[in-house]
Amino acid sequence: MQYTKNNSKSRKSDTNTLFICFSSLLVCLLVLAACKPASNFALTPTPIRQATITVEPTASQAPPTLRQLADQQKWLVGTASDPAYLTNPQYTALLDAEFNGLVGENVMKWGRLSVERGIYDFSKADVLMDYAARHQMAVRGHTLVWDLQLPDWLTQSILTRDEYKVILKEHITTVVGRYAGRIVAWDVVNEPLDAQGHLRQNFWFQAIGPEYILLAFQWAHAADPEAQLFLNESFAEGLNEKSQGVYALVSGMLEKGVPIHGVGMQMHLRLENPPVPEDVAENMQRLAELGLKVHITELDVRLQDAPGSRDGKLVAQGVVFEDLARTCLAAENCEAFFTWGLTDHYSWIPGMTGKDDEPLLFAENWQPKPAYWAVYAALRDAILAAQP
């Protein structure tokens, strides 16, 4: 079957009409949610300008948090974090209440762990791991093999292929071994493909050859046989040349007996070009047919370049988050939904683009945005649908 499609589908034909439709859709969803039977909580919208929608408790009990709903659904809802953020009590109160999963934004990347060959500093990564253990949060490890954020001692060396293999094996064995039994899933190889779905001629491809991917998974599995091992890729959530390349790559790995358990769909998205939910669902399904899991690993949705008012864009952003949450919840193999940051205040995007943005579930003032309530409603509906 040919899975390559054009992601620029009819949803973008008239942007202004689209945002009006999004606004109407979210209002309808919230009204329908409030009318559903067998619920012990209800959603009550307040004006979008404040970016808050309150949850009113019933007389018998307080409403569940997003984390409590996720625990009930046996679904990982996580976020990227950093030890520096964990010193803020406002941050940790929100983190503990709303998320059951954690991933290091940068602390487990090679350049942060080992600035000299053979010498590792795990102190910051350990802070994150210890915090997760105390608060009963599952941890995803990110990332073992990437061509960015490598230490200078490695990138500036001129070594033989065998020497590079020794270094890569030592790194994977050291890092995975340190946290064996404590990390549920590793992004073993990060972003190996180009936009056309071919292997990029990156640092590791040039140092070792295309087999660096297979070797990395084998070494990671040897270091922790219980950890789930993922290939993590960007812009490959829908049906396009890149996702076709991912499918071909992981299919070949499975045929060779390589221990791979899933595909990470990063999903750093732009509001003006969201993925088509049906395409994402089809992509997840074909991976399920291979026996592979899917994790949404780095989700954020940029607003800055989309047309329309801020209020309209916040509502439209919520629809994108909701579409993806519902798609993941409906897929038999999609087990995790991670955003790349907790609040807009800590997002990486403004630092990269130089523009203010609001890509996450919580606003800079710590209040939940329409995107949060959209994910909440999707999770709540999945739980209600499963009730007899």
Residue ranges and their predicted role:
Residues 21-33:
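Bacterial N-terminal signal peptides
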Residues 83-98, 166-175, 241-253, 320-325:
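Short, acidic/polar
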Residues 79-92, 110-123, 193-198, 236-245, ...:
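Acidic-and-aromatic substrate-binding clefts and catalytic sites of carbohydrate-active enzymes
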Residues 315-352, 363:
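Substrate-binding cleft of secreted/luminal carbohydrate-active enzymes
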Residues 57-101, 105:
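Boundary/entry segment of secreted carbohydrate-active catalytic domains
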Residues 30, 35-64, 69, 385-388:
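Ser/Thr-rich, Proline-interspersed low-complexity disordered segments
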Residues 97, 101-115, 124-236, 303:
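Substrate-binding cleft and catalytic face of glycoside hydrolase catalytic domains
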